Amino acid sequence: MNELNVVNDINHAGNWLIRNQELLFGYVINLTSAIIILISGMFIAKIISNGVNQILITRHIDATIAGFLSALMRYIIITFTLIASLGRIGVQTTSVIAILGAAGMAIGLALQGSLSNFAAGVLLVTLRPLKTGEYVNLGNVAGTVLNIHIFYTTLRTLDGKIVVVPNNKIISGNIINYSREPARRNEFSISVSYNTDIDLVIKVLKRVIENEDRVMKDRDIVIGLSELAPSSLNFIIRCWSSTDELNAVYWDLMVKFKKELDKNNINIPYPQIDVHLYKKNKN
């Protein structure tokens, strides 16, 4: 009896396979196609990811950001490939896309600040308003750029402090880059007493500037009387030098100005106030 049942089951299975062979063949084709799509998509994702990473590295973009962006590109391609594979075997991809969209929206709301920093980081490495090694002013902090990371940028101030600034704060504010241009202008203010010969002062200051080799002679040099102050005549000097030597030129010229003024007996006055006393008549 048991043997008869087994034979009947085999016959039923064989008949079912014969009746549904076309359907089964279609399933096999679709499943094979889905596997091929998935494998091909993963292979293409790897190639594109490596290509994007290589391009970003070639453009001197931070390795951390380049790796993150290339990995993000890879996962996006794999996700779309997976959806296409599921659709090939008959899964309703509309619901899958809706679920992924809802999940993405929820994650986006939860990580709103972080995503803002990430987007700002992408803009920083793409637009490149600042680069590693440049000295910048970001409004409330100034320093040399050490690293531009995915979510934040690190600066080192002149007194050696390490400051971490969120990227969205940088991209939404003003960026003053002191290192981008090869030349910058120095400005000096020199005060002398009122009894000093103005022409002599200009002559002395001009001689100091002309004897300084690091001052660019092909750029505008301004020396003039800028203010009649209460206690002094104030002169302004403007000259250009290379960005790398800007501070050194400033300190050296200040010393040379003082020495030359002393040699020519030109005094730098102290602030003074004239006090007039009147004797009150008792009558």
UniProtKB/Swiss-Prot annotation:
Would you name any one GO CC term? plasma membrane
Superkingdom, natural source: Bacteria
Q: What is its main location?
A: membrane
Keyword vocabulary terms for this entry = Cell membrane, Membrane, Transmembrane, Transmembrane helix
According to the UniProt record, which cysteines are disulfide-bonded?
none
Localization terms from the record: Cell membrane
This protein's membrane topology, according to the annotation, is: Multi-pass membrane protein
Q: Does the keyword Membrane apply?
A: yes
InterPro entries per UniProt: LSM_dom_sf, MS_channel_1st, MS_channel_C, MSC_TM_helix, MscS_archaea/bacteria_type, MscS_beta-dom_sf, MscS_channel_2nd, MscS_channel_C_sf
Q: Where are the transmembrane segments?
A: 24-44, 64-84, 96-116
Answer yes or no on keyword Transmembrane helix.
yes
Q: Name one GO molecular function term.
A: mechanosensitive monoatomic ion channel activity
Q: Which NCBIfam families match?
A: PRK10334.1
Q: Which family does it belong to?
A: Belongs to the MscS (TC 1.A.23) family.
Q: Which protein, by its recorded name, is this? A: Uncharacterized MscS family protein BUsg_437
- Protein's organism: Buchnera aphidicola subsp. Schizaphis graminum (strain Sg)
